[in-house]
Every structure is written in C-alpha cells, then in structure tokens.
C-alpha cells in the first residue's frame, strides 16, 4: 500500500544553503522557507533540537565535499515531535530522533523547524532520554558507540588488555562519548587532544591519562613503534592515525571514524602483517535499524554527565559557531535549540 505524503503546514525557519553557477556555496538564515521547498516524506517532524557536527560545520562555512545537492537545509541530526504521519509506527505526538541516511547531505536536514522524513529512518526516543539529550547523542554518540562495539566484536576486553585504549580528538563530540563509554566498561583510556587545558574535563569523563596530540605527531616516522595501546578510537585520520596504528600492540584493534586531521593514511602494512592489528572503518550513516535500535537502547541506559558535555546554542547562532567546530575548539557536544 502506498503511504500518503504529509500535507503542507506553515512556513519553516532554518538554515538554507544554495549554490551559484560556479558552485560557490552561500548560507542564509530564512524565516520563510515554504513548505513546497521542504521536499516530501511520510512523517512531518516539529524539530526541537539538532546538533552541530563536523559535516554541518563544513556545509555552513561553504566548504565542499559534504552537500550532494543544493539548495539544502543542513543538519545531519534532528530530534523532535511528530506532527503528522502516515506511518503507523510513528503517530502524531511521537518523540523521534533521526541521524544519517543522507539528511543534511542530499536531502533536507535538521537545522530548521520542520523536517519531512521517511518513517523507516526514524528511531523512537527512549523514555530515559529527553529530546535535547537525544540530539546530544545524535551522530556523535552513535558513532562512538559503533566504534566501541567494533573493539568488543574483535575480542578486546578490559580484563585481557593490559594496555590502554587511545582516543584521539578526545575533547570533541565523538571523543567525549568514546572516553566515557570506554571508561564505563572498565577500559584504561588515554585521551589524546590538541587542548591539554581540557585535561580536567577528560579525567572527569574517565580518562586515565591525557596525552597531547603533538606528542603523538612527534613520534618517529617508522613502520612499527613501541606497543603502547591495545586499541584505538580515531577521529583524525592522516598522520595521527598512522602513528597510532604503528603504536598499537599485537592483535590490537583500531576503529577509524573521521578525517578531521586529513583523509590520507601514510602508513605501511607492517602493523597488520607483523602484529595482526585490525583496522575497522566506522560508518554511522547507513547502519541498519536493528543496529541503531540496539545501540540507542544501550546509550539510553548510560548516565552521561550532560551538564559537562553539552553546550547549548540558538539556531540562529549555528553559522557563528561552525568555524569553532572545524577548528576543534569546542568541547563536548554543541546542541542547537531549533524550536519550542
């Protein structure tokens, strides 16, 4: 049976990114986004909160490589309340969260007061999470949870792994969740950061040791370095990831989920064929719903220190804060208050 598409409602307020004939991107804060500009979907969501992710910051600052089409509303995360639906699983009044599936990249995303989505892409927000907290988890928390699950899947355990697990970009969004999750599971965690002034924050989250990013980057450019880590959760890519792979112990596991430090990987096969190191890629965009539901249930059971992890901003301020996200100077999670 074909589902009825959602009807039109009042105008939407949000960020609108367009492109000129040369491909140059520009962003506008609009209060008059017409409903016919929102596309289609079988669930209409009144967005209450979104978050400012690295991809969103790239889009808002006109950087190429994220948006697959324009004009577009950015925002790869959205949390809010269903206003109208033809999907019986998500009746009006349901609280839902959306991450990935190309929203904010090739179809309109969550940095606007209304979002038209497909029910098959939605997750019901667990009762233990507020809508704001669900947005805080969003892509960042889900990515960290996937990375931790990858380590566990490859038999990395705190009781059999005497060496710590390294987390790069530890003071950022994904890194903060990763440090907390690993510590709560009993792992010893080495938090790697470019901002050692956040040492108290990282220790509060559960890090055993805080290490400067420059210290890792200054390690010799060798195929194999002394075995320092049983596992790695990396958000940086580039030279930093290469040094961490070279420092991973025998049978260790490295989960890579970002490229804030570069998309290249200047390493060799030596760690993989001489130490049996496993490199796992973490894709948070197109994970099946079964995986999403399982990990969201797990995240909802955790007692995250939200007051320490969240920075709240207004929707109109997203463009101003975006360069700070790209520069890596925001701590924890930037949550965007979108609507009432």
Over which residues does each language-model region extend?
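Glycine-rich beta-strand-centered segment in the early N-terminal region that forms part
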Residues: 36-51, 63-103
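Short amphipathic alpha-helix with an adjacent loop that forms part of the alpha/beta core around
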Residues: 216-227
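Mid-domain Rossmann-like dinucleotide-binding core that forms the NAD(H)/NADP(H) cofactor-binding site
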Residues: 135-213
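Residue-level marker of beta-strand positions
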Residues: 77, 94-95, 114, 184, ...
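N-terminal Rossmann-like NAD(P) cofactor-binding module of classical short-chain dehydrogenase/reductase
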Residues: 97, 230-233, 255
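Glycine-rich phosphate-binding loop and adjacent beta-alpha segment
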Residues: 239-304, 339-340
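C-terminal hydrophobic helical "lid"/dimerization subdomain
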Residues: 10, 292-340
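NAD(P)H dinucleotide-binding glycine-rich loop of Rossmann-like/cofactor-binding domains
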Residues: 99-165
């Amino acid at each position: 049976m074909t589902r009825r598409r959602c009807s039109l409602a009042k105008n939407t307020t949000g960020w609108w990114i367009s492109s000129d004939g040369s491909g140059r991107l520009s962003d506008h804060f609009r209060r008059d986004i017409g409903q016919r500009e929102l596309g289609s979907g079988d669930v209409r969501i009144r967005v209450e909160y979104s978050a400012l992710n690295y991809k969103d910051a790239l889009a808002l600052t006109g950087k190429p490589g994220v948006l697959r089409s324009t004009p577009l509303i950015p925002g790869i995360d959205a949390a809010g309340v269903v206003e109208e639906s033809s999907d019986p699983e998500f009746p009006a009044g349901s609280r839902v969260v959306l991450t990935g599936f190309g929203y904010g990249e090739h179809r309109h995303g969550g940095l606007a007061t209304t979002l038209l989505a497909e029910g098959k892409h939605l997750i019901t927000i667990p009762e233990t999470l507020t809508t704001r907290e669900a947005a805080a988890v969003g892509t960042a928390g889900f990515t960290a949870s996937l990375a931790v699950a990858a380590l566990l899947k490859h038999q990395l355990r705190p009781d059999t792994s005497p060496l710590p697990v390294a987390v790069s970009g530890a003071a950022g969004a994904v890194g903060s969740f990763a440090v907390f999750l690993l510590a709560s599971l009993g792992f010893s965690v080495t938090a790697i950061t470019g901002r050692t002034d956040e040492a108290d924050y990282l220790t509060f989250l559960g890090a055993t040791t805080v290490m400067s990013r420059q210290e890792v980057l200054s390690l010799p450019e060798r195929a194999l370095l002394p075995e320092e880590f049983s596992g790695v959760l990396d958000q940086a890519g580039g030279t930093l990831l290469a040094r961490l792979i070279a420092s991973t112990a025998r049978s260790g596991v490295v989960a890579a989920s970002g490229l804030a430090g570069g998309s290249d990987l200047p390493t060799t096969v030596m760690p993989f064929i001489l130490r049996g190191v496993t490199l796992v890629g973490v894709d948070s965009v197109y994970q099946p719903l079964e995986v999403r539901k399982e990990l969201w249930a797990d995240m909802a059971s955790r007692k995250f220190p939200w007051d320490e992890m969240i920075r709240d901003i207004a929707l109109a301020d997203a463009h101003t804060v975006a360069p700070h996200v790209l520069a890596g100077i925001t701590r924890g999670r930037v949550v965007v208050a979108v609507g009432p």
